[in-house]
């Protein structure tokens, strides 16, 4: 029980410090996000504003990818600690899939 409490505290600390940085395929946008969905930074390369309409789409898609990657980092840590078959890991994975859907569809929606 004490070991579980220590592991739980470690996971919580690790999750609060986890970030992911993702760059768009065209290199115009770099986003750093936390697994909670919080955005730490948005960086644009010079000349990125040449086509503002497509830049908006690129920013939105890159944010979604960064949020998902950050959340998946926490899931990997949870799987290593609790096991891949853990009901808690399964529940968190379902929440991640709902909150941060894979980019690639025509729209990106968040709950």
Residue ranges and their predicted role:
Residues 3, 26-33, 45-48:
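Membrane-targeting and insertion segments and their boundary/processing signals
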């Amino acid at each position: 029980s004490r070991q579980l409490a220590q592991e739980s505290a470690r996971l919580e600390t690790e999750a609060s410090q986890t970030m992911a940085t993702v760059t768009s395929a065209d290199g115009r946008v770099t986003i750093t996000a936390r697994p909670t969905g919080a955005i730490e930074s948005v960086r644009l390369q010079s000349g990125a504003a040449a086509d503002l309409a497509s830049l908006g789409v690129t920013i939105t898609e890159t944010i979604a990818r960064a949020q998902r990657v950050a959340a998946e980092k926490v899931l990997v840590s949870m799987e290593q600690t609790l096991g891949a078959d853990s009901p808690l890991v399964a529940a968190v994975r379902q929440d991640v899939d709902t909150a941060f859907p894979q980019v690639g569809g025509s729209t990106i929606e968040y709950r």
